[in-house]
Amino acid sequence: MVKRLLILLCLAAASCDKLEVTHMFIPLSQDVNKRVEESLVWNAAAGVTTLTVPRDNYRWYVCSDIHVDQNRPARFAEMVSREKADEDAFFYQMLGDILFGKEHLDWVSDIMADPSNDPGFAIVGNHDLFYEGWETWKAAFHSSTYYYYVETPQFRDIYIMLDSANGTLGEKQLAWLEDVLETKRDGCRHCFVSVHTNILRTDTSQFPSTNFTLEETYRILDILTGANVDMVFSGHDHVRDISVFGGVYFITLDSIKDDASNASYMTVDVGQTIGYSFIPFE
């Protein structure tokens, strides 16, 4: 394993492009703290988004890990088109790793910014930060730490989006998460949290930079289970997984990468109860 990592480091160091190699292997909390600060500044100026839907039962779509390389993201575009055509659906989420290399973020951001499509909400992934990608990502999406509401005729649901692209939430974001749950969760019917990196990992398929420390995992679990969070969605591993801890569902998505054999997205049906389905591509 050590030999393999050393080979990867040497290959990356030989590249002409400025790849942030250190960040791939060592979680840097100062990076996420800086991004959180910038995200919260944007949030304060922009205000909280509230989506109003005409019924108490509604649907939303969620995907992760597009990994755009040299071709436009056909499966992501298809999912957005399906969501728009679905009369029960009103928005979608994209949980990070838009990029594989350093180019063509606009192929996704243009789809998400198209006013003819339903609203889309994104968070940053670890691949999106390589090649100093945060500035490009921020210019397109503005914030990766935020929450929004969905208002129905009788209820309000809260959706919390988190930045874990360095394999840590960092102290600033943890404090922000605790505050949001303490001050905004009451009065909401359901609470959904979305994050790129898996909080409950069931395999070791990804780099160690994206593992939460055990201490941080315990703290996050304590925060989430103590605030009556319903579901936590993540991507990153490219292989679906469903775990339950403390009454909270932790769901890892497949990737939606065009050449992935197991590519899928999810639909989530929200009402008095919550249902979900993985939708594969044929």
What do these predicted ranges mean?
Residues D65, G96-D97, G125-N126, H196, ...:
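Active-site glycine-centered loops adjacent to acidic/histidine catalytic or metal-binding residues
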Residues V2-L8:
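Sec-dependent signal peptide recognition
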Residues D17-D106:
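N-terminal active-site segment of His-dependent metallophosphoesterases
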Residues A12-S15:
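C-terminal motif of bacterial Sec signal peptides marking the signal peptidase cleavage site
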Residues T49-Y61, Y147-M161, H190, V244-F250, ...:
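Beta-strand-turn-beta hairpins that frame and shape the catalytic cleft
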Residues E20-V41, R240-E282:
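Binuclear metal-dependent phosphoesterase catalytic core
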Residues S81-F91, I158, G167-F250, S277:
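His/acidic metal-ligating clusters that form di-metal
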Residues A74-V150:
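Core catalytic region of metal-dependent phosphoesterases/phosphodiesterases
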